């Protein structure tokens, strides 16, 4: 009997020991595992707020089944399908939410000059509109403005310059708020074309217009969220983006992107001295260059995998947008036509052709893509009242508006962070 009790006591002690061990293990593991009733936290999708400017100058876009309506419907449908809580409002001197705005599925079907008559539609204060929108833009909010984006001031004295300066100040405050909230800020400016049937306002003069007119879609918010939005909406490619999309430009407070051997390769294929470049194992830096003394110059090229940059191809192919140092290196051409084996893993590589003048070699070159207002903005802008319809692709003072936004970002960046990207290539030896 005593022997049986002893055995039972040993078993009981063993069970207690196991239970204590398990409990101890649970306590120790609390730092690595969530309690059973705790759900894994995921980053929430932002809320998308779409603002349609409804001043009288916008009426001409909605009198027919225009590309404007098609693009707006495309924008609303895709945003509402991907983001929960998508909200649509009219905006002019204030923000107005009508019952029509709640019916996202049928909003465009019901859109016409009469249904847009809410608030003060007699004039446009684009700076006030920007301020109202940016005051409602936070880390988890993507704001989208659809507007013809015209300053309602004449270029008399310093009025237009003052309006652009006000735009700069409004966006600088938004950038500062974003940084205070520990994130970077971004703005995307897209120009779209649409049929227009109505009055075009050249200052206070109403001019009948039946033809194509530009308007703008401007996306503002957290850089990461805006980048994702552009990807989900397929805005990188003009063919899959908004109907009527003609130009796009993205600017952010993010520091300069440093390219490396995963985004750039050096090659000399299709050049007369192709065999004389021996690339390093990384495919970018050069282990050895054999110099032909009979050649006065040395030609080579860089293949860049930068197609995901949110910019028009025309911007990426404009060699005036690039800068190279030291001065003996010159850019002779930028194109997307050359096909090289070295760049097969790049999607739509950009080829930057270069020359070293007079065999005056340097051990390192630095290539930069400058961040500046694209040429299309100037081409699509006029700033003096004409008294008649402008060219179909032109908007009044759109350059001043974009320059105002650009200046806000430019002034908020360090001097060495104002390029879109920078690339350094080392030449280790010559013979």
Regions found by a protein language model. Name each.
Residues 2-49, 56-62, 421-431:
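Acidic, polar low-complexity linker/tail segments
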Residues 178-301:
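Eukaryote-biased recognition of electropositive, low-complexity segments
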Residues 133-206:
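A charged, solvent-exposed segment within the mature domains of Sec-exported extracytoplasmic proteins
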Residues 64-75, 113-131, 158-179:
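Well-ordered, non-membrane alpha-helical segments in soluble/globular domains
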Residues 264-431:
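Extended non-globular C-terminal regions
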Residues 58-63, 96-102, 151-161, 196-201, ...:
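Extracytoplasmic/secreted cell-surface and envelope-processing proteins
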Residues 40-147, 151-152, 187-189:
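Von Willebrand factor
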């Amino acid at each position: 009997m005593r022997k049986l009790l002893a055995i039972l006591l040993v078993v009981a002690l063993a069970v207690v020991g196991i239970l204590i061990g398990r409990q101890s293990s649970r306590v120790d593991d609390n730092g690595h595992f969530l309690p059973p009733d705790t759900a894994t936290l995921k980053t929430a999708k932002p809320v998308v707020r779409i603002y349609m400017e409804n001043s009288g100058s916008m009426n001409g876009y909605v009198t027919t089944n225009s590309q404007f309506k098609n693009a707006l419907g495309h924008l609303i449908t895709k945003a509402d399908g991907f983001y929960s809580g998508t909200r649509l409002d009219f905006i002019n001197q204030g923000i107005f939410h009508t019952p029509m705005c709640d019916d996202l599925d049928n909003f465009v079907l019901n859109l016409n000059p009469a249904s847009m008559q809410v608030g003060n539609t007699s004039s446009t204060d684009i700076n006030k509109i920007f301020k109202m929108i940016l005051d409602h833009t936070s880390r988890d909010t993507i704001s989208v403005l659809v507007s013809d984006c015209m300053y309602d001031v004449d270029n008399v004295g310093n009025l237009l310059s003052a309006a652009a300066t006000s735009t700069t100040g409004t966006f600088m405050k938004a950038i500062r708020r974003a940084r205070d909230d520990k994130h970077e800020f971004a703005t995307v400016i897209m120009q779209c074309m649409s049929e227009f049937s109505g009055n075009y306002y050249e200052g206070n003069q109403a001019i009948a217009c039946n033809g194509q007119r530009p308007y703008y879609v401007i996306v503002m918010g957290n850089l990461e969220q805006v980048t994702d939005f552009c990807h989900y909406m397929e805005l990188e490619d003009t063919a899959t983006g908004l109907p009527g999309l003609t130009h796009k430009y993205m600017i952010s407070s993010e520091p300069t992107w440093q390219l490396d051997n995963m985004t750039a390769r050096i090659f000399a294929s299709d050049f007369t001295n192709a065999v004389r470049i021996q690339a390093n194992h990384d495919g970018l830096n050069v282990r050895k260059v054999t110099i032909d003394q009979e050649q006065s110059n040395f030609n080579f090229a860089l293949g860049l995998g930068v197609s995901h940059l949110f910019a028009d191809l025309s911007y990426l192919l404009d060699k005036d947008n690039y800068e190279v140092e030291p001065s003996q290196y010159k850019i002779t051409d930028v194109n997307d036509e050359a096909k090289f084996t070295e760049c097969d893993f790049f999607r739509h590589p950009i080829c930057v052709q270069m020359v070293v003048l007079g065999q005056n070699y340097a051990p390192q070159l630095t290539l930069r893509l400058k961040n500046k207002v694209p040429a299309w903005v100037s081409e699509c802008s006029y700033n003096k009242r004409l008294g008649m319809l402008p060219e179909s692709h032109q908007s009044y003072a759109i350059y001043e508006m974009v320059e105002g936004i650009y200046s806000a970002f430019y002034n908020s960046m360090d001097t060495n962070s104002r390029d879109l990207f920078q690339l350094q290539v080392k030449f280790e030896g010559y013979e």
